[in-house]
């Protein structure tokens, strides 16, 4: 499994670099930059023909926007109606008239999806934390229930993006265990246990620098066989 940026790839005239998160009409400081969102979508979902991209905690819509703008089917969900309205505004600003967004609970995805939904090839997650998290469930329980809910409807791959402490060295290969930076909200062992308990198999992780006090880790997992 290799990892990198695809430049000049996608529909003609499309440029994720020109759609910086801070330029969207509906913006939150925690929003992912489009290049990272596009990379996560491609890694989780593979070739366009594989099926739809599921973004069950869509927030401002970053993953879903990049999926749609690259020619994929996508479903963006959020429990917060304000986020759904903002995500729709952002997708229209990006140049699409599609409406792939729906109000729904990430911990009960099956109840939100319609029976005629396209086959889902992968799921992308950038979980909220603290004041950015909705509802009374703490962020650990929220992530655990969301991973289990996603596994019920996805028999493919998962990309989970987590904030981390910064690394002094940038790597262009998967992180070895001794190279993993401390995560901001979890222990690495907790993440691996969560994945295992919810039907996912940890494969690899990569580090992406954000600024001198923050990094992000891209965790890649595949669906484990279910009994």
Task: Describe every region a protein language model picked out.
Residues 1-227:
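Class I S-adenosyl-L-methionine-dependent methyltransferase catalytic core
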């Amino acid at each position: 499994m290799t990892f990198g940026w695809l430049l000049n790839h996608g529909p003609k005239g499309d440029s994720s670099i020109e759609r910086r998160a801070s330029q969207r009409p509906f913006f939150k400081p925690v929003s992912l930059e489009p290049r990272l969102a596009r990379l996560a979508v491609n890694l989780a979902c593979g070739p366009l023909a594989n099926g739809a991209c599921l973004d069950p905690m869509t927030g401002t819509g970053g993953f879903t926007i990049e999926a749609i703008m690259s020619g994929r089917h996508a479903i963006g969900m959020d429990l917060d109606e304000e986020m759904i309205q903002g995500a729709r505004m952002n997708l229209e600003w990006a140049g699409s008239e599609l409406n792939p967004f729906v109000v729904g609970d990430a911990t009960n995805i099956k109840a939100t999806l319609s029976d005629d939904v396209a086959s889902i090839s992968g799921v992308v997650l950038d979980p909220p934390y603290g004041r950015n998290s909705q509802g009374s469930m703490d962020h650990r329980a929220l992530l655990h229930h969301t991973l289990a809910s996603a596994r019920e409807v996805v028999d493919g791959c998962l990309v989970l993006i987590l904030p981390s402490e910064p690394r002094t060295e940038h790597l262009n290969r998967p992180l070895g265990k001794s190279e993993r930076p401390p995560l901001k909200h979890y222990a690495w062992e907790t993440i691996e246990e969560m994945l295992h308990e919810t039907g996912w198999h940890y494969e690899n992780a990569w580090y992406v620098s954000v600024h001198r006090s923050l990094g992000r880790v891209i965790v890649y997992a595949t669906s484990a066989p279910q009994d």
